Amino acid sequence: MAFLLFFVFVTAAVLCFVVPAFLLLCTSVQRRRDVGQGGGRDWQKKKKLRLPPGSMGWPYVGETLQLYSQDPNVFFASKQKRYGEIFKTNLLGCPCVMLASPEAARFVLVSQARLFKPTYPPSKERMIGPSALFFHQGEYHLRLRRLVQAALAPDSLRALVPDVDAAVAATLAAWSGGHVASTFHAMKKLSFDVGVVTIFGGRLGRRHREELRTNYSVVERGYNCFPNRFPGTLYHKAIQARKRLRAILSEIVAERRARGGGGDDLLGGLMRSRDDGTAGAVALLTDDQIADNVVGVLFAAQDTTASVLTWILKYLHDSPKLLEAVKAEQMAIYVANEGGKRPLTWTQTRSMTLTHQVILESLRMASIISFTFREAVADVEYKGFLIPKGWKVMPLFRNIHHNPDYFQDPQKFDPSRFKVAPRPSTFLPFGSGVHACPGNELAKLEMLVLVHRLVTAYRWEIVGASDEVEYSPFPVPRGGLNAKLWKQEAEEDMYMAMGTITAAGA
């Protein structure tokens, strides 16, 4: 009976909420579509092509119930085992082609990226802002991407290390004391603070910072809700908070203009950037375009990074010998900095070899971004199969990361595997191609600094079960990994006595 009630609940939820939401994204594509558009030899060639193997499930709903009634990763893995590395399905009313090989991922994201466009539900675009760079292709996207990449390049990040370090120190200090707290929630606060520093530098006042934090949290809570504008719903509250974010950001921009300059941070770059008009005219980005891209960067910088940080704490906690080795590496830097009296430097973060391997393995194991959505803009042939125009195409990053053909014993947490670089296109934690995450180096810097501060000054203990996974929407240990954190005395004397300290230059 309990199972029946659960099944009815899931079915009702999908039919009443999830399906309508996603149908806003999906165009109606007939199951048996006419692939003979055009004429001559092209028509004859397409006529011979076949759709990939797979099941389309029930009308409209497709295989959505199967997906949501189990771990999504198990669903995709079972499909790959049955049909191979390219298969079709229907999810939330949309026909999809799933691709689970490095070659296919490269085909969609890099070599033939022009044939596939990013696709998001309209409700998501409204929430973040339609001018955010990851909703676009072409010149506008490339120009903004270059701007963001410049703000997050090594030369720029070098100057951000003290700010990131200060944000990490403040987060851990607020968490410490032995009380139980959600690791994920603490890491979300940290990632938000790092995002704010990256966008605004050190120029943002406390009032604006707290207003941004308050309203952004409301937007975030409504982001994955059914887009119901009825007053009182989470979605309606999120839309109102998004309007307030626009007003706050316009006020910040106006204050900077009044001071006569934009500054050398990301916001300053956006304020100086110009938009190529359709008639060839060039104008500065509008306040709406600036606001959309600021919210977009905050969105991209928070939950994904916070999820990985949460997994890093779990993996280190569950691997005591590895934790001691990481601690030895970090204590060498800590002692070289006179017990933390001198600031951590960019050069030192580049010397954290084992810690960097731990981060890469955490990215692989957790595979926070399990897949990405694209849409075919034309009929596409791939390995003798037809990918029809309008179908969704999903490179399955997690399936690639957990394939024993590319990573031996893939379910084992083994950072040493990254002593050797992975084969091309087999490790895609930040995507690939022109839409790959431009903030990947910032995210890794945040992770390195957190591990340094954590293992040299704190100890932590996981409270309760931590093996189950929940999706919010990214995978994290259930409950966000409840844990206690304590400040501990520095251990540099012990490490020096053991002879494990080596010179670590600044």
Swiss-Prot record:
- List the EC numbers from the record: 1.14.14.137
What is any Pfam family matched here?
Answer: p450
> Which topology term describes how it sits in the membrane?
Single-pass membrane protein
Q: Which GO terms describe its molecular function?
A: (+)-abscisic acid 8'-hydroxylase activity; heme binding; iron ion binding
Alphabetical GO CC annotations of the entry are: membrane
- Which domain of life, per UniProt? Eukaryota
List the catalytic activities from the record. 2-cis-(+)-abscisate + reduced [NADPH--hemoprotein reductase] + O2 = (+)-8'-hydroxyabscisate + oxidized [NADPH--hemoprotein reductase] + H2O + H(+)
Which tissues show it? In internodes and expanding leaves. Weak expression in seedlings.
Q: Where in the cell is it found?
A: Membrane
Similarity remark: Belongs to the cytochrome P450 family.
**Which PANTHER family would you find in this protein's record?**
ABSCISIC ACID 8'-HYDROXYLASE 2, CYTOCHROME P450 26
The protein's name in its UniProt record:
Abscisic acid 8'-hydroxylase 2
**Which gene carries the instructions for this protein?**
CYP707A6
